[in-house]
């Protein structure tokens, strides 16, 4: 979910 920097699952 971040700006391509860190992958965080937006659930």
Swiss-Prot record:
- The chain's coiled-coil residues are none
- Modification type Valine amide: residues: 11
Q: Name one Pfam family in it.
A: Periviscerokin
Per its UniProt record, what InterPro entries does this chain match? Answer: Periviscerokinin
Taken from the UniProt entry, a GO cellular component term is: extracellular region
The places in or outside the cell where this protein is found are:
Secreted
Would you say which domain of life the source belongs to?
Answer: Eukaryota
Chief localisation class = secreted
Q: Which UniProt keywords apply?
A: Amidation, Neuropeptide, Secreted
Tissue specificity, per the record, is: Abdominal perisympathetic organs.
GO annotation (BP), single: neuropeptide signaling pathway
Function in brief: Mediates visceral muscle contractile activity (myotropic activity).
Q: Which family does it belong to?
A: Belongs to the periviscerokinin family.
Indicate what this protein is called per its UniProt record. Periviscerokinin-2 type 2
- State the organism named in the record: Celatoblatta sp. (strain Blue Mountains)
């Amino acid at each position: 979910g971040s700006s391509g920097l860190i992958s965080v699952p937006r659930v």
